Amino acid sequence: MASEEYGEPAKHDPSFKGPIKKRGCTDIICCVLFMVFLLGYMVVGILAWLYGDPRQVIYPRNSTGMYCGIGENQGKPNVLYYDLLKCVTGTNILAAAMNGLQCPTTQVCVATCPMDFKWALPNGSPASVYIQEYCQPSINLTTTPLTVAQIAAKELCPVFLVPSTSFFNRCFPGSNLTFPSDFTINGLTANQSRANISEAASQILDSFNFQNVGKKIFEDFAKSWPWIITALVIAMVVSLLFLILLRFTAGILVWVLIVGVIGVIGYGIYHCYMEYDTLNKQGVSVSDVGFTFNLGVYFRVKETWLAILIVLAVVEAILLLVLLFLRKRILIAIALIKEASKAIGHIMSSLFYPLVTFVLLVVCVAYWGMTALYLATSGAPIYRISTVNTSVPGCENITGNETCNPMTFKPSSSCNEARCIFYRYNNEGLFQTNLFNLQIYNVIGFLWCINFVIALGQCVLAGAFASYYWAFHKPKDIPFFPVAESFMRTLRYHTGSLAFGSLILTIVQLIRIILEYVDHKLKGAQNPCTRFLLCCLKCCFWCLEKFIKFLNRNAYIMIAVYGKNFCVSAKNAFKLLMRNIVRVVVLDKVTDLLIFFGKLIVVGGVGVLAFFFFSGRIPIPNDSFKSPTLNYYWIPIITVVLGSYMIAHGFFSVYNMCVDTLFLCFLEDLERNDGSQEKPYYMSKSLMSILNKKNRPPKSEEKKKKK
């Protein structure tokens, strides 16, 4: 029944000796479409580069529209706001700074932010009251004929300065300011001045708590990056050592891995029981705590530890049952891993191919990021005349709609508080009106290129490992440069097929992004039915994406071996897997699970080491090598864990692809051959012994044995 529904088993082909040498180009239409799309993607990048100016985001501007830190303001990377009260009243200062906006007060580029309090005394001389560094370049305090009051009225120098810190090159007031007792501004009393400045500073700090958090995170990275790199190097070394050990002792390592997981869960059960027993004797119950958002409280009640204990016990029981009933399947999985170890041992260059994939992925991400940045900053900046208080005599006619040029703008005598401030970027013109469409094109190009690079790596590795499996006399029949040959063969003949498969995956991922966007926009305004429908759609497309990734992976293996187009290869791979569905579910997934556990060992080991190091729990006798004092020690720990997982995934993905390729070839081998002299098996003797298969010796040897 299975044969009729999912096709007949593959028949023996005497001429088949592994990946077919003579093949033609596949999915040419999709190849042409992909090339045209890439040309369009390059055009989008060129247009973005011509029209965009990322300096508008990277560098702040002064009141004249000049960038701080470059050009005439070289060495002055920070911008200082003269009247902080106007910034708080007129606009959201941090949001304005992040979007390139300016608040309605004079801004100048400065080398460093103010470190001390300073305020203007009306009876002093300009040189003694003001600081030249923080005044506009047009005024010289030693030679100016203007008085202190006239300079303050024209905002040529700041009336007051408070200790500030630089955040994204903007000078913001520091927290917990202690004002001098005689501090006064704008004719206010000392108490009123302190109250106004404190309120302005607190509004900024309270509205943007992430200011200090973000700054501290950057500081943590600056302090800990050498140790982060050291931890990532350790992760790479551990991954290589694990693969080397797997090369020689696959069976022992797999069983140690399984026993280790069971032991860790067993220890978790023991620890939960001890915590439960201690809290039970103390009589602390969840009824005594009630409902609270402080999750740490729940770990001080016995019911929490009892629930965790039950869950771990159930997981432990399931694992033991799986080991009991699937022991033979695990032995076959171990044999596949051993065979993969042998294959990688003969094709060591395959371990370095993830570096090629990584470089290509970095190029894709960098191109997407730069294109998005240049597109976002395209269009000339528009400035408009604005003032904080339109009720001031002479400022009634200022509506905020009149454009201006910050390079030539000067306040009128009737409204001295008028300022020329940034409004937005110009969105008129053919290019600017299509920015949203170009950003969508950029996202699609990013997803398609990323998926194509991953597909290329899978197909290249599949071709290399397939050449190992179908080599009857190993290693004599293995090509000299299997990875390089597979790479050139894949690019020459199957670019269209890889583009086709990656396009299908890109469409599904794009639909998922749209669903996430719709869900985000409708959050808080959707009814339960809409929420349920969106949740179902997101779940379905998540499953569809996983299925397409699985199908594409096996289709690329068939493409690498037989050189057929994507649809035929996907169909043949799907039918082959369905004809052997039990082996697929048990053998392939058990192997994937074991490799996943290997990743966890690498990531967990390096993560635990990073935790003890960055939390200061590892005593280092040498003072020159010690964990830095960090604000948030979990930031480098998370970075190390994520980086370790990426490194481990890169190395183990080679193993995973090798096992998947050998498994698919193994299924084809079982269908094509029967062990006879005309149809000998290509699988290793260990696999044949587990399956009770063997190749019959030649007739001449049989006669010798009979004699």
UniProtKB/Swiss-Prot annotation:
Q: Does the keyword Cell membrane apply?
A: yes
Q: Which domain of life is it from?
A: Eukaryota
Give UniProt keywords alphabetically: Antiport, Cell membrane, Glycoprotein, Membrane, Transmembrane, Transmembrane helix, Transport
Topology feature Extracellular, residues? 49-225, 271-305, 376-442, 516-556, 615-633
Q: Name one GO molecular function term.
A: thiamine pyrophosphate transmembrane transporter activity
| Glycosylation sites (chain numbering) | N62, N140, N176, N191, N196, N389, N397, N401, N622
One Pfam family recorded for the sequence: Choline_transpo
Query: InterPro entries of this UniProt entry?
Result: Choline_transptr-like
Cytoplasmic topological domain residue ranges:
1-27, 247-249, 327-354, 464-494, 578-593, 655-707
Q: Main location per UniProt?
A: membrane
Q: Where in the cell is it found?
A: Membrane; Apical cell membrane
**Membrane topology classification:** Multi-pass membrane protein
List the GO terms this entry assigns under cellular component, sorted alphabetically. Answer: apical plasma membrane; plasma membrane
Q: Name its GO BP terms in alphabetical order.
A: acetylcholine biosynthetic process; acetylcholine secretion; choline transport; neuromast hair cell development; otolith formation; positive regulation of cell growth; thiamine pyrophosphate transmembrane transport
**Family from the record:** Belongs to the CTL (choline transporter-like) family.
The record's function comment reads: Choline transporter that seems to play a role in the choline-acetylcholine system and is required to the efferent innervation of hair cells in the olivocochlear bundle for the maintenance of physiological function of outer hair cells and the protection of hair cells from acoustic injury. Also described as a thiamine pyrophosphate transporter. Also described as a thiamine pyrophosphate transporter.
Protein name, per record: Choline transporter-like protein 4
This chain's source organism reads Xenopus laevis
